Amino acid sequence: LTDKTLHDGYIEYTLLYDMIANRITIDEVKAENGGLRLMKNLTWEYDALPHALICGGTGGGKTYFLLTIIEALLQTNAQLFILDPKNADLADLGTVMDNVYHTKEDMIECVNAFYEGMVQRSEEMKHHPDYKTGENYAYLGLPPCFLIFDEYVAFLEMLGTKESMSLLSQLKKIVMLGRQA
């Protein structure tokens, strides 16, 4: 699904077609101007739509897709925070980059710190001399920040009810601040 248009009395859905012909190689996946080119005819405009959910069946390529996104974002000034509760493929990135977490305590601390950082950044943006209502971090020349959470549902299952609710609350707040900060 690439677009959904509400018309008088019906909804028009636009679907992506001919995916194989429109594929690009991993080295062609580029992050530029607030967007990430994923296919010849598909760009994720993360400045405008900052949230992404990647899902698929076991062995469907989700982890390689995430690694491709991470590799492209590392070529920019983006700040990445990666959480891998299964201590699997994404956790291995901790040997070559900072801000990669896999233990319960470190992951919870990262989510909390990420939220606090967004709140602080939002306040700093409001005091920036070029601040303008309705604009986001990119307007002020700030780097994008990404919280990449692999298998977050599996992580929630590892937590007790109180911890799980607290983490979900923080994630909801992060989503709310998403595009602005």
Where are these regions (language model features)?
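Long, basic/Gly/Ser/Thr-rich N-terminal segments
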Residues: 1-13
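Polar low-complexity intrinsically disordered regions enriched in Ser/Thr and small residues
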Residues: 12, 37, 134-137
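P-loop NTPase catalytic phosphate-binding loop
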Residues: 14, 18-126, 143-146, 152-181
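Short, glycine/acidic-rich hinge or "gate" loops at secondary-structure transitions
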Residues: 126-138
